[in-house]
């Protein structure tokens, strides 16, 4: 899968932008703060339904604006299914008061997890050196993101695991506050 084009609207430091990519090699050159990493983050967002920095969607909307929209065009070189198209359009929209929406060829996904792995992507940025020097949390997040793209069952199990972990931690917090378990907490 190769990216062919990208349109950004009110994403991070971009009011709007339109990019056409070479099939071979693309280089982004500019001074600090010009948006090179934000451009890469937009591509990542279209593939993973989130920013690579793990921030809330509100934090990727351009300052003092209400929404953002990303539109990416990809070339599917491995037409796995006979009916699959060679060109794919992915749109990501975040608007106030609405759920995030990801569309493939103008059809919205019911669950964002259905999209993960459609366009495999790995991003490595200078801060990722922390994976080697800091704790295991960053390494685990990197591996989870990568493996989730390769194996849909892994992603489903990861979502379930994180949900159960959140419930367990909430139950332990309630227990610490009340010093008692009730039937609801025991089920968790």
Report the location of each language-model feature.
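An accessory alpha-helical subdomain
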Residues: 130-188
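Short amphipathic alpha-helical segments enriched in hydrophobics
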Residues: 43, 47-51, 172
